[in-house]
Amino acid sequence: MARGSGAGGGGGGGGGGLELSVGVGGGGGARGGGGGEAAAAVETAAPISLGRLILSGMVAGGVQYGWALQLSLLTPYVQTLGLSHALTSFMWLCGPIAGMVVQPCVGLYSDRCTSKWGRRRPYILTGCVLICLAVVVIGFSADIGYAMGDTKEDCSVYHGSRWHAAIVYVLGFWLLDFSNNTVQGPARALMADLSGRHGPGTANSIFCSWMAMGNILGYSSGSTNNWHKWFPFLKTRACCEACANLKGAFLVAVIFLSLCLVITLIFAKEVPFKGNAALPTKSNEPAEPEGTGPLAVLKGFRNLPTGMPSVLIVTGLTWLSWFPFILYDTDWMGREIYHGDPKGTDPQIEAFNQGVRAGAFGLLLNSIVLGFSSFLIEPMCRKVGPRVVWVTSNFLVCIAMAATALISFWSLKDFHGTVQKAITADKSIKAVCLVLFAFLGVPLAVLYSVPFAVTAQLAATRGGGQGLCTGVLNISIVIPQVVIALGAGPWDELFGKGNIPAFGLASGFALIGGVAGIFLLPKISKRQFRSVSMGGGH
């Protein structure tokens, strides 16, 4: 979703005052993986038109299309293969690992790549090929598991575990996470490299616009229940309607990503990097390159600007309040709102699948609201200050997460059993849930912009080090994701499954984050504030 996804947004590219291209995935920023000092050693490319710059960033839309499907469909789907609700969160551990390991390494290598095709395009091509492979493995995991020895019963009859398919699926899921991280950083850096007279701010806006477009198309695809009707050959003995819909959506993702990739490779003309060139400083004196990677980021804790530790604390609390919903939003719709069960009776399975599709539609609404809200962040911060905007968004998330629990209880008020056994739901409740999804687009826009803008401004007042500060900020995002991935499933299991306990905990974290923000966040100049988008991603 132009969501954070979870880990793995874009790394590099950036520069130019407070304009900073940032991602969740490790060590990004104005330097990491994107144009940093090594960019100075590249011959200046010929200026390109705005239209060509726009087409050069199209690959971001293709990558985000697949990421939107991953966010909306994959947590619910893996439960149909046998993985328990309590264990599904562990599957998402790969995100922060990929962000911390892949992003810095790819950023470093792409900065110094001497290929005749340029520094960024070889990594973009490699990453996209791996993404296509990963989504095919995920989409056909049930069929692969069937061939490897899973039950030979028809999927319309057998609803038990299929462990070969589940293992294949998880491997594909992890490959997809690593592949996304391989593409995002160089793709952002490519836009910064080519921005020229248009400026990094324009390049960042184009990149984020493509990601928003990918989100909208991806969530629309995920909410569609007709792929198995349009392409009936997708259904097999191991793959029924829900699986065939997933398969169809991912096959379209391969086609769309391939189209976006080809256009980017054609229109993004890079000047090859000369590996023996010096790395100049502002004073035109040679300097040793700054450290790159997780260790350099960890060492940076010793040299943080004033106010940055407080930003890290509030950022961590803010993301702790968001990750449960990011991981389980469509699962919540399938279980608590539509009263389905991925391992239950046929009516329960159908109800669960309907809820997941409704959740994907809710994420579509969320992305649309997020896109419009993003344009309002900078004016609001200039008027009342980024601290007020950030704190207010945390309190809104607190209310929204508490509302999910209240809506869940409302949905079950006439049923005296467990979440998984209720089969009916009120249409008004479903409508309220969609409104809630859309409403959350507003604080999500704040989450994707304000913390990074505050970090950029603190670094600027210190006289530099934006890439380092952003890399350190990334740690305050990755650690909460690890905490939620390890703890959300067992926490829900402790209270009797369902998603209500995790959402209740998220509400508490949002409240603490809001209160902490009031007392800890540094005062930032309203007049000098410049909005910075992390551009979604993982």
From Swiss-Prot:
Assigned keywords, A-Z? Cell membrane, Membrane, Sugar transport, Symport, Transmembrane, Transmembrane helix, Transport
- Listed PANTHER family: SUCROSE TRANSPORT PROTEIN SUT1, SUGAR TRANSPORTER
Q: Give residue spans on the Extracellular membrane side.
A: 74-81, 145-162, 220-247, 328-357, 410-433, 492-499
State the Gene Ontology terms under molecular function: maltose:proton symporter activity; salicin transmembrane transporter activity; sucrose:proton symporter activity
Q: What is this protein called?
A: Sucrose transport protein SUT1
Q: In which tissues is it expressed?
A: Widely expressed. Highly expressed in embryo, endosperm, germinating seeds, source leaf sheaths and panicles, but at very low levels in roots. Expressed in phloem companion cells.
Tell me, according to the record, the phenotype of the null mutant. Male sterility probably due to impaired pollen germination.
What are its GO cellular component terms?
membrane; plasma membrane
InterPro entries per record: MFS_trans_sf, Suc_symporter_pln
GO terms of biological process kind: maltose transport; pollen germination; sucrose metabolic process; sucrose transport
Subunit field text = Homodimer.
| Membrane topology field | Multi-pass membrane protein
Function per UniProt: Responsible for the transport of sucrose into the cell, with the concomitant uptake of protons (symport system). Can also transport other glucosides such as maltose, salicin, helicin, and alpha-phenylglucoside. Probably required for apoplastic phloem sucrose loading in source tissues (e.g. leaves) in order to transport it to sink tissues (e.g. roots, flowers). Probably not involved in transport of sugars across the symplastic discontinuity between the endosperm and the embryo. Essential for normal pollen germination, but not for pollen maturation or starch accumulation in pollen.
What Pfam families does its record include? MFS_2 (PF13347)
Biological pathway: Glycan biosynthesis; sucrose metabolism
Which CDD domains does the protein's record reference? MFS_SLC45_SUC (cd17313)
Q: Which family does it belong to?
A: Belongs to the glycoside-pentoside-hexuronide (GPH) cation symporter transporter (TC 2.A.2.4) family.
Q: Which residues cross the membrane?
A: 53-73, 82-102, 124-144, 163-183, 199-219, 248-268, 307-327, 358-378, 389-409, 434-454, 471-491, 500-520
Write the lineage as a comma-separated list. Answer: Eukaryota, Viridiplantae, Streptophyta, Embryophyta, Tracheophyta
Task: Tell me how activity varies with pH.
Answer: Optimum pH is 5.
